[in-house]
Amino acid sequence: MLDMLFTIRIGVSVLAFIIAALSGIALIPYLKKINFGQTILDIGPSWHKEKQGTPIMGGFMFIIASLVASAVGYTVYRLFYFDVENSLAANGMLKLISCMVFSILFSAIGFADDYIKAVKKQNLGLRAWQKMVFQFLICVAFLVALYFLGDKSTEINLMFISFDIGIFYYPLMVLVMIYISNAVNLTDGVDGLCGSVTVVTMLALTTICMIIKEYEVSMYAIAIAGGCLGFLVWNLHPAKCFMGDTGSMYLGGSFVAISLITHNHLLMVLIGLVYILEALSVVIQVSYFKFTAWRHFKKTGEKGKGKRIFKMSPIHHHFEMCGFSEYKIVITFSLVALVTGVISIVLQYNV
């Protein structure tokens, strides 16, 4: 049975790869035709200016690929290998649908952001508070869905220790979901980076979902991995298109949704460590700059004289400024994700 489940997942990942890779042939020229190009802000590395006009919303490649491949894979599983009386995962289909809907809704926020940038020519897109409000509502809805699907635990699970925080679990999880999903968005700043790291994180989540018998959700995770691989055909340096916020918010949403299904919060942090460090570098940079600027103002009365810890944030830009090539950054960050992913799998397997 497990051999057949493994075969189905391989088929799902290959199908997602093919759909994503081939869809770029039609999607990229179309995005160029309607002038959906990237606007490069002056605050980024100067050499990124050459990427001005590169099509955005390429994330539709792996969004469509992962949804279609998951649906096909689940249909095959349901028709030929699903035992109604001995379901391998309680409420598996509903959990799968919940993850998909959550990811699509997050992607819709990203689409609105991309649309405003590309069509309205407003470089910053949606305002931060607008994104936060929509993300908050979607996260609350997802947690409510999980609750009615039977996931009523309010314990923080750190593998070898867990503790119940009661009603405070829900606001904490909303904050964690918003933080990590936006962290994935921040990781999309170098050609191929977010896609490559996500391939690794989704493969890790696939394995963990298989271990804990969340087989339906594991199908979605491996479909995203395959879709991202297909997208990388067009996104590795020099990128022919970018995933845009449409894609990165979809990946962020899917990562937190699938991670919450595993109900292992330590593994969420370990597997998503690259994302978390990317966002943390921004928090540290901004906080330190504001603190030192405030201290300088108190001493001298001059404004805007803050100091920076990194040459630029998120941290992948710091490495760029230090002379790392985009390829080297992608390989290094992906290797870090691979190491943390393997550690997570070993920990889960030995619990």
How does the language model describe each region?
Residues 1-32, 63-111, 115, 142, ...:
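Alpha-helical transmembrane segments
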Residues 28-45:
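Membrane-interface loops
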Residues 37, 116-118:
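Membrane-helix interface/capping segments
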Residues 41-55, 121-134:
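Juxtamembrane helix-capping/reentrant segments at transmembrane boundaries
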Residues 119-127, 156-163:
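Membrane interface segments of multi-pass transport proteins and intramembrane proteases
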Residues 126-151:
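Internal, non-catalytic "lid/hinge" segments that mediate substrate recognition, gating
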